[in-house]
Amino acid sequence: MIHDDDPNAPGAPHDDATAAPASATRAAPAAGDDDDANPLHLRRIRSFVTRAGRVSTGQRRAIDELGPRFVIPYGSAQPDWDAIFGRRAPRVLEIGFGMGASTAEIAALRPGDDFIGVEVHEPGVGALLKLIGEQQLSNIRIIQHDAVEVLAQMIAPDSLDGVHIFFPDPWHKARHHKRRLIQPPFVAQLAAHLKPGAYLHCATDWQNYAEQMLEVLSADPSLENTAQNYAPRPGYRPVTKFERRGLRLGHGVWDLVFRKKHAG
């Protein structure tokens, strides 16, 4: 997810990085974790770690007033997204949008595209709904659920024009790297839901995770890198306050943009 400017928001940066994920907070490993028994880990991968968050009065009002229109309940059937958005347009899935400021900015910058934002934490959902109302955005819908399950159940194969995964939890301790979202089985799942020629854009402020992302994405046979290694930041991805602060301190940010190969 992209980091937003509320220092008390889910995903506010930790001491040694410029940013932190809203949908995947640094948390202690769950007791009884049996990832090692499953070499693919796909059933164990989650796009978030459960944690509490305070919903403000404004966020609650936005949820109550705008949620019925803009929040799509999770279900096991694939919705008619054209009917939901009221048009047929390029469709982008964003996994973990945090407090939603950057999501709203991208949607405003690209009014011809439709965005499905997935975020489990209610304060972030309320914050994005508030921005949707304030900016009168019609090209965003929200699913408050685990992105792994949303992708498997609610998104048709070969249907997405793009996927954004900005600043996911780096799980910086080596023994926790297996919990990182960007792993071969999940990348294969993402690629299967992209249209040929569609893009997957990841960003991180952890060099070790950037290196792993590059390795994993490069190894997927259905994807190709749009750059030699790391990509320049695309103009549509905003630079957040925390990212600017980190850059001033000499911290790096790495963008990776891959495309799904055309058949043949």
Swiss-Prot record:
Q: Which SUPFAM superfamilies match?
A: S-adenosyl-L-methionine-dependent methyltransferases
Which pathway does UniProt place it in?
tRNA modification; N(7)-methylguanine-tRNA biosynthesis
Q: Which GO terms describe its molecular function?
A: tRNA (guanine(46)-N7)-methyltransferase activity
Domain of life of the organism in this record? Bacteria
Q: Where is the composition biased (Low complexity)?
A: 18-31
Q: Which GO terms describe its cellular component?
A: tRNA methyltransferase complex
Record flagged with keyword Secreted: no
* One Pfam entry name: Methyltransf_4
| InterPro entries cross-referenced by the UniProt entry | SAM-dependent_MTases_sf, tRNA_(Gua-N-7)_MeTrfase_Trmb, tRNA_methyltr_TrmB_bact
Where are the residues of the annotated region Disordered? Answer: 1-39
PROSITE patterns, per database record:
SAM_MT_TRMB
Instruction: Enumerate the active-site residues.
Output: 169
List positions binding S-adenosyl-L-methionine. Answer: 94, 119, 146, 169
Q: Which residues bind substrate per the record? A: 173, 205, 240-243
Recite the UniProt keywords alphabetically.
Methyltransferase, S-adenosyl-L-methionine, Transferase, tRNA processing
EC numbers, comma separated: 2.1.1.33
Task: Quickly give the catalysed reaction.
Answer: guanosine(46) in tRNA + S-adenosyl-L-methionine = N(7)-methylguanosine(46) in tRNA + S-adenosyl-L-homocysteine
Entry's Gene3D superfamilies?
Vaccinia Virus protein VP39
Q: Which HAMAP family match?
A: tRNA_methyltr_TrmB
State what this protein does.
Catalyzes the formation of N(7)-methylguanine at position 46 (m7G46) in tRNA.
Q: Give the similarity note.
A: Belongs to the class I-like SAM-binding methyltransferase superfamily. TrmB family.
What name goes with this protein? tRNA (guanine-N(7)-)-methyltransferase
Its source organism is Burkholderia mallei (strain ATCC 23344)
Gene that specifies this protein: trmB
